[in-house]
């Protein structure tokens, strides 16, 4: 830029030749230009100095900022700047356009320098006071103000700030200078556009200065047009304002339409695609350069009055300068106006010439070639086979493409054969390549590349992620990066080949081409369609001119004036540009043929609910692709096509046009990433979905773009996410079986992901009959997924591993189907089903893409976890609002509202709080898809876990989710929606079926399971991967955990107290359970994240936590000595017992979870629990992680009471450690657990899993009793030799007492705790009782516990924290199998049972005897009574405990939820306000436990009420 500017300035100033010299410098290479930039600047400076009185200023300004820099120099600089501006304009636009090119780089450097220098000269632009600001302002203002303010500023600055005189003084100066200024501003801001301009400028420079000037004007307009329109307006606006009439016409024409014709075309182009538009603009310009030049000249001459009328402009400059300059630099401007004016006249020519040069040739200047454009490619044959495969290196638009061209006569999947043009080979391989790419992307990657050269550019912006866009995946596509090319092409090739071969080659090719093009083209063309049409039209004309076909076929489209040499070009064009229903009709047959099943379902759903349909479409893309493509990406494009073809397609067609710009940007953004064909499909779907509904995009962007309202914002926000998703997908593309997995092709591994969908969908489909139709995405998937529905079993082959879980799953499925059917019907199947279809589609897509996308998202979310709180809280606030709405109409109405708004929020949550949910989405996806997608890095662990326990985890997670359709749906929804709010919505929608808060279960289980159990049930795969993360994080977090637990306790106390009560107020007022579930879903881990975020963001919280942590650490340390042995022993005991239990309860990984290492490596255990929950004994190592977690989940459901009691005890212990940290005596139990916060937590969880396992099955309980009774009764009673029993006993007793002595024993128990904890661990239980009793202390412990896990272990913490949440969800779910057991039992059930069992096993006579008797009575009593009597429940007889365990199971599996919900409501009111809001589910679970066995539930309730609150 500087060079051009300097050159322009030089040339403009004394000689145009100088400008030419500068132009020559530009001509030199990018490197030379970069090097020459300064030299040229110096030269220009010197020349300016020589030429202008303000040469120095001008030079420095010129140097400083392309043209704008002069403003910084001052009035004298203004003159020089005017010159420079003029020259800069030419050069700046060049710089701008070159910026993107290598030239662009040079110019960018110059521009950057100029921009930096321009900062002063920015004043030129609009802020006289701050050059920099001015320039920035220009840039900033450029979009909207640039034309007006910037043009004024530019003028003022040009005249006043050395550039201002140019702008204002001289029309030419203004035009050129403004162009330069605009260029400068654009240069930075619109590097893409600039680079286009730059290219143009470069070539134009070669062409001539006059062209340069014109081009600058044009470029100004080009850039000005579209995103750059303001710049153009700015450039010309300066001229216009400066020169009033002179620039004004230019401004009007240029800014509004691009300089008259040129600008108009440019503006078309520019609007068409910012960069592309400009690129196309350049191309068009080249094509229309002559006409543009003439127009530009006219305009230039119109502007020339600016430029040409040096005399008037100086006056104008003076007048304008006073007008504008007074604002900015009127004096300087006026003074230098005349000289600058004259110089500017020269500059004018220079500027025009510079810009025009690079217009045609710069590929970047020309957007991606429009489909149907005829191109002649020159290439070198790399390889040709006898089979009709030609590999060529083609240079197109200065880009080299490697393409594999297929002989369409020999390859059915080759590009359409209907191409008859002289360039038919290229067309076939290139233009047809689109169709071919769809068909033989893999077969002809190179072909597509060469084709992409011709079409790839088009594809680039067209959302290379389209069937034809898949071409975008061509290497040439660039946006569709080679990875996509490879993955897409390869995948597309099989699918394409299969489909294409299966279908009539011509029809298939045509349809596929059209259809493939359809999604991509529609997105692409729609994004560029309107502009592209004009653009493509000249472009087409230009290209067509190049083509030899004498007769051009006019596009029949009413608004399309494009002409094509062959029908093929027209078809390609139509496929991409006119993918609306008419074109869809054209391609619909193929789409129907390919995806008729999915399409039918999709159309139904899509037609049924445009949003769900879009979601379905997106989902179908994921799903249908597999269906048509047998899980191959081609199938995905077909899904897209289907999507396009289907009602969603129509919707998308219409909306895609609208959103095409948006989507185009998104697609471009996404396409820039190596986007997988599937992702591309998803993106296209998203584009379509974006157009048709945010749903599809949400689907793809899942939570991010879910809301239409937020679609734009989230699209932007999620663009990054999607980019990540794209990257993930590109990564996963290889592993992308997931995407195909959604496809109903069971044969492939994808079938497993399909199974994932199936498990979800199966649950959804079976669970939601109406949803099945509505969730046509599931339905498209459903036809295949119905085959795959068994796949839930496949997915859940591990499910099979756990027959109990399977049975639970079946029970829950049945139950939830009933409930879902009920509620689906109640909710209004169409609306809810549509919503669910959308949600599930989103979920399916989210599940597929999210598996990766969410994985990335998860990583992102992990990052977000810390920074999440702000956005989360804001989103949560919106979610709360949404929850108010939703919860007002709990299950039915909320589904749409939540589905859209909440889902949006969910998507936001996905980004924000839902990160965990996406994690879990990933988890679910990963868990389910890990089998299919085991190869993916993220799922590598999961695959192990999935294979060993990961599959189990998945199956269990799936079981937990897929066991009940409601659960599955909720999982799906949870995955889709977030996994919190989303889960809530989904649950409302899907779980709403369950009269009880099934939706809440999904909230908890999906969200908690997702976040915490990312490594647990659904996290089986993702969980493994994330389990690994969790392992790492849990190890890290475990370390943090101590801090986090303690800090989190405080934080949670505060956050829970503040946030949850707020949320609670919103939600609790609604359905307490729903509120809880929503908040749990949203806040369960969201709170953790909030805590974490608060920790990260809130120094106060950190201080509080650290303080709390220190207090607890002291207690912990003390207790660590006394309690560590106990803890270790406890861990060992659970390990031993659980090891046995593990063997016995392989179904219940909790046995594994409660291994001795849990104490030493609580983090590890946590990780293991989280990730390997599914891994049972198979992957005891892993399984222990996952299995432990899952076992905990399962054991939780079985041992919800024990867990609750245990949790209460643990919380009581923690509270003790918090409270007893002051009372060092009673800190022992807490220290035991707290000493190693992780160990302690793990002990609780280990105990939980252990006790879950123990109480998972009565056998385990009995065995544990035998084991524990002998070891515990004797040693653990008071000697606490088996520290485990003692600890457990004490824990049990503590929660009992905590529950029991809610108020009475509080002080006593505290004292007792102090006394007992140290002396007798199990006696400490009573002491813990006190600690637990103290609501705040308990709450703190609860929060701490909850928070500690969630905080460091957003994933892993899911065991306790998520258990806390999920149990309600899962409990309410008939299949609390994983989540309920996992979640609830950890706190209520496990605690209660553990207490009972521990008390019984290690018959601490005091507690056990009394409480045992009480246990039966008290356990039978309700929550309030439970609290006071929780010790009794803790101590209930072993038989009672076993009975309770059975009840617990029954209760957990079928209708613990019912009572749970009732109780949940009760507890919600009570426990929810506190952290229990998060653990309220435990209370709910406790309620569930109460339902099954109120005794256990009583314990759980008591512990669940307050301990539940404190429980973490």
UniProtKB/Swiss-Prot annotation:
Please state the span of the N-terminal signal peptide per the UniProt entry. none
Residues modified as Phosphoserine are 421, 424, 493, 627, 782, 895, 964, 1098
Q: Zinc finger regions typed C2H2-type: which residues?
A: 553-578
Q: Does the keyword Zinc-finger apply?
A: yes
The residue stretches assigned to a coiled coil in this entry are 278-304
Question: What residue spans carry the Low complexity bias annotation?
Answer: 51-74, 151-185, 260-270, 960-973, 1183-1192
Compositional bias segments (type: Pro residues)? 781-790
Provide this UniProt record's keywords sorted from A to Z. Answer: Coiled coil, Isopeptide bond, Metal-binding, Phosphoprotein, Repressor, Transcription, Transcription regulation, Ubl conjugation, Zinc, Zinc-finger
Q: Can you list the GO cellular component terms from the UniProt entry?
A: nucleus
Comp. bias regions, Basic and acidic residues: 201-218, 713-729, 818-858, 1030-1054, 1125-1145, 1231-1241, 1253-1276, 1291-1327, 1437-1453
Q: Where is this region: Disordered?
A: 1-23, 46-74, 89-237, 260-295, 417-545, 622-665, 713-750, 777-858, 925-996, 1011-1066, 1117-1192, 1220-1335, 1423-1459
GO biological process per UniProt: negative regulation of transcription by RNA polymerase II; regulation of transcription by RNA polymerase II
UniProt keyword Magnesium, yes or no: no
Crosslinked positions for Glycyl lysine isopeptide (Lys-Gly) (interchain with G-Cter in SUMO2)? Answer: 283, 880, 1118, 1176, 1182, 1199, 1216, 1234, 1250, 1292, 1310, 1414
Q: Where are residues bearing Phosphothreonine located in the sequence?
A: 481
Q: Which GO terms describe its molecular function?
A: zinc ion binding
**TM helices/strands, residue ranges:** none
Polar residues bias: start-end ranges: 220-230, 449-458, 526-535, 925-934, 979-989, 1055-1066, 1146-1157
Specify the domain of life of the species encoding this protein: Eukaryota
Function of this protein? Transcription factor, which represses ZNF609 transcription.
The family database entries (PANTHER family) matched by this protein are listed as: BRAKELESS PROTEIN (PTHR21564), ZINC FINGER PROTEIN 608 (PTHR21564:SF4)
Name of the protein described by the UniProt record? Zinc finger protein 608
Q: Which organism is it from?
A: Homo sapiens (Human)
Q: Which gene encodes it?
A: ZNF608
């Amino acid at each position: 830029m500087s060079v051009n500017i300097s050159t322009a300035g030089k040339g403009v100033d004394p000689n145009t030749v100088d400008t030419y010299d500068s132009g020559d410098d530009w001509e030199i290479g990018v490197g030379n230009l970069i090097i020459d930039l300064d030299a040229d600047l110096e030269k220009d400076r010197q020349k300016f100095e020589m030429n202008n009185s303000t040469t120095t200023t001008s030079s420095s300004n010129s140097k400083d900022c392309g043209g704008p820099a002069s403003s910084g120099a001052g009035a004298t600089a203004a003159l020089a700047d005017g010159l420079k501006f003029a020259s800069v304009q030419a050069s700046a636009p060049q710089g701008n356009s070159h910026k993107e090119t290598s030239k662009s780089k040079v110019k960018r450097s110059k521009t950057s320098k100029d921009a930096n220098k321009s900062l002063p000269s920015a004043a030129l632009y609009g802020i006289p006071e701050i050059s920099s600001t001015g320039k920035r302002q220009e840039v900033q203002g450029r979009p909207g103000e640039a034309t007006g303010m910037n043009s004024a500023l530019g003028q003022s600055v040009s005249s006043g700030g050395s550039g201002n005189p140019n702008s204002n003084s001289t029309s030419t100066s203004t035009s050129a200078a403004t162009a330069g200024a605009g260029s400068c501003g654009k240069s930075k801001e619109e590097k893409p556009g600039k680079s286009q301009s730059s290219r143009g400028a470069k070539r134009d420079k070669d062409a001539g200065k006059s062209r340069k000037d014109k081009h600058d004007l044009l470029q100004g307009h080009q850039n000005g047009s579209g995103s750059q329109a303001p710049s153009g307006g700015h450039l010309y606006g300066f001229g216009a304002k400066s020169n009033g009439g002179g620039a004004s016409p230019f401004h009007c024409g240029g800014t509004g339409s691009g300089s008259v014709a040129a600008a108009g075309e440019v503006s078309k182009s520019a609007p068409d695609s910012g960069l592309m538009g400009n690129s196309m603009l350049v191309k068009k310009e080249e094509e229309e350069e002559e006409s543009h030049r003439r127009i530009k000249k006219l305009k230039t001459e119109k502007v020339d009055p600016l430029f040409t009328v040096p005399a008037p402009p100086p006056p104008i400059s003076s007048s304008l300068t006073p007008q504008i300059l007074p604002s900015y630099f009127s004096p300087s401007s006026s003074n230098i106006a005349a000289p600058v004016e004259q110089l500017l006249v020269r500059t004018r020519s220079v500027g025009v010439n510079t810009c025009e040069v690079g217009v045609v040739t710069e590929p970047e200047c020309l957007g991606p070639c429009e489909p149907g454009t005829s191109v002649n490619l020159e290439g070198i044959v790399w390889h040709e086979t006898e089979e009709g495969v030609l590999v060529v290196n083609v240079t197109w638009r200065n880009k080299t493409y490697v393409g594999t061209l297929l002989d369409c006569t020999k390859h059915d999947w080759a590009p359409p054969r209907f191409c008859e043009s002289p360039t038919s080979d290229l067309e076939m391989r290139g233009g047809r390549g689109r169709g071919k790419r769809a068909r033989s992307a893999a077969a002809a990657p190179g072909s597509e590349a060469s084709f992409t050269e011709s079409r790839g550019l088009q594809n680039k912006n067209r959302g290379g992620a389209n069937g034809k866009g898949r071409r975008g995946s061509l290497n040439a596509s660039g946006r569709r990066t080679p990875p996509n090319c490879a993955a897409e092409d390869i995948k597309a090739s099989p699918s394409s080949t299969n489909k294409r071969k299966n279908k009539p080659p011509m029809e298939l090719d045509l349809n596929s081409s059209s259809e493939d093009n359809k999604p991509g083209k529609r997105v692409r063309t729609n994004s560029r369609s309107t502009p592209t049409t004009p653009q493509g039209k000249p472009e087409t004309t230009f290209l067509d001119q190049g083509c030899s076909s004498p007769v051009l076929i006019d596009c029949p489209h009413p608004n399309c004036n494009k002409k094509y040499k062959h029908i093929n070009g027209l078809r390609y064009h139509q496929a991409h540009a006119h993918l609306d229903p008419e074109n869809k009709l054209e391609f619909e047959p193929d789409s129907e043929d390919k995806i008729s099943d999915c399409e039918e379902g999709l159309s139904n759903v899509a037609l049924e609910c445009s949003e769900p349909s879009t979601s379905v479409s997106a989902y179908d893309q994921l799903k249908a692709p597999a269906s048509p493509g047998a899980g191959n990406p081609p199938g995905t494009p077909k899904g897209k096509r289907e999507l396009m073809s289907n009602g969603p397609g129509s919707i998308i067609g219409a909306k895609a046009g609208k959103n095409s710009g948006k989507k185009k940007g998104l697609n471009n953004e996404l396409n820039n990433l190596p986007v997988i064909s599937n992702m591309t499909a998803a993106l296209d779907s998203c584009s379509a979905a974006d157009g048709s509904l945010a749903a599809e995009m949400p689907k793809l962007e899942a939570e991010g773009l879910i809301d239409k309202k937020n679609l734009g914002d989230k699209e932007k926000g999620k663009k990054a996410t999607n980019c990540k998703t794209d990257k993930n997908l590109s990564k996963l593309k290889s592993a992308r079986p997931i995407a195909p997995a959604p496809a109903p092709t069971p044969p492939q591994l994808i079938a497993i992901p399909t199974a994932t969908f199936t498990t979800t969908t199966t649950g959804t489909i079976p669970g939601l009959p109406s949803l099945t139709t509505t969730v046509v995405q599931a339905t498209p998937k459903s036809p295949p997924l119905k085959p795959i529905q068994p796949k839930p079993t496949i997915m859940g082959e591990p499910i099979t591993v756990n027959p109990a879980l399977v049975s639970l799953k079946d029970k829950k499925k049945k139950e939830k189907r009933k409930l879902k059917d009920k509620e689906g019907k109640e909710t209004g199947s169409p609306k809810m089903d549509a919503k669910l279809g959308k949600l599930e589609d989103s979920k399916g897509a989210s599940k597929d893409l999210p598996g990766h996308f969410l994985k990335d998202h998860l990583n992102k979310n992990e990052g977000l976890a810390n920074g999440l709180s702000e956005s989360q809280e804001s989103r949560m606030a919106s979610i709360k609002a949404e929850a108010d709405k939703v919860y007002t109409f709990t299950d039915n109405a909320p589904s749409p509202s939540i589905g859209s708004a909440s889902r949006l929020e969910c998507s936001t949550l996905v980004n924000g709080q839902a990160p965990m949910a996406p994690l879990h989405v990933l988890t679910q996806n990963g868990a389910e898809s890990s089998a299919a997608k085991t190869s993916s890095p993220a799922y590598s662990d999961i695959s192990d876990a999935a294979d060993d326990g990961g599959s189990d985890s998945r199956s269990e997670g799936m079981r937990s989710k897929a066991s009940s359709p409601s659960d599955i749906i909720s999982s799906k929804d949870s995955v889709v929606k977030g996994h919190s709010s989303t889960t809530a919505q989904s649950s409302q929608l899907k779980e709403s079926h369950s009269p009880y808060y099934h939706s809440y279960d999904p909230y908890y289980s999906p969200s908690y399971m997702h976040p915490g159990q990312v490594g647990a049930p659904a996290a089986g795969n993702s969980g493994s991967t994330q389990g690994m993360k969790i392992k790492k994080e849990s190890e890290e977090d475990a370390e943090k955990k101590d801090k986090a637990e303690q800090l989190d306790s405080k934080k949670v106390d505060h956050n829970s107290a503040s946030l949850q009560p707020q949320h609670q107020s919103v939600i609790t007022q609604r359905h307490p359970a729903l509120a809880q579930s929503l908040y749990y879903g949203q806040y369960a881990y969201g709170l953790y994240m909030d805590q974490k975020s608060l920790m990260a963001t809130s120094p106060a919280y950190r201080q509080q936590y650290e303080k709390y942590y220190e207090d607890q650490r002291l207690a912990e340390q003390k207790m660590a000595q006394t309690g560590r042995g106990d803890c270790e022993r406890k861990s060992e005991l659970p390990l031993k017992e659980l090891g046995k239990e593990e063997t016995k309860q392989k179904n219940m990984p909790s046995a594994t979870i409660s291994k001795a290492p849990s104490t030493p490596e609580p983090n590890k255990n946590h990780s293991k629990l989280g990730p390997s929950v599914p891994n049972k004994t198979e992957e005891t190592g892993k399984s222990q992680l996952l299995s432990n977690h899952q076992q905990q989940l399962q054991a939780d459901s079985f041992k919800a009471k024990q867990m609750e009691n245990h949790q209460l005890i643990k919380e009581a212990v923690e509270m003790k450690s918090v409270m007893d940290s002051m009372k060092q005596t009673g800190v022992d139990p807490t220290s035991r657990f707290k000493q190693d916060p992780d160990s302690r937590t793990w002990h609780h969880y280990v105990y939980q899993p252990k006790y879950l396992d123990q109480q998972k099955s009565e056998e385990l309980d009995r065995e544990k009793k035998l084991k524990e009774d002998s070891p515990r009764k004797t040693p653990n009673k008071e000697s606490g030799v088996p520290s485990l029993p003692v600890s457990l006993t004490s824990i049990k007793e503590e929660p009992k007492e905590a529950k029991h002595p809610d108020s009475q024993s509080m002080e006593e128990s505290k004292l007792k705790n102090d006394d007992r904890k140290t002396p007798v661990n199990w006696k400490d239980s009573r002491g813990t009782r006190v600690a637990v009793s103290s609501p705040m202390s308990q709450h703190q412990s609860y929060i701490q516990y909850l928070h500690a896990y969630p905080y460091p272990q957003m994933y892993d913490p899911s065991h306790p924290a998520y258990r806390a949440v999920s149990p309600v969800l899962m409990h309410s779910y008939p299949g609390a199998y994983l989540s309920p057991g996992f979640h609830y039992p950890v706190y209520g059930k496990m605690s209660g049972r553990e207490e009972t069992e521990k008390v019984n096993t290690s018959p601490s006579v005091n507690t056990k005897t009394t409480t045992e008797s009480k246990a039966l009575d008290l356990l039978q009593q309700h929550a309030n009574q439970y609290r006071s009597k929780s010790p009794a429940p803790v101590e209930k007889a072993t038989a009672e405990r076993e009975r309770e365990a059975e009840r617990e199971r029954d209760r957990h599996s079928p209708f613990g939820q019912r009572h749970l919900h009732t109780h949940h409501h009760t507890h919600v009111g009570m426990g929810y306000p506190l952290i229990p809001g998060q653990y309220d589910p435990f209370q709910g679970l406790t309620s569930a436990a109460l339902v099954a066995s109120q005794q256990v539930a009583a314990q759980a309730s008591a512990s669940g009420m307050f301990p539940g609150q404190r429980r973490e």
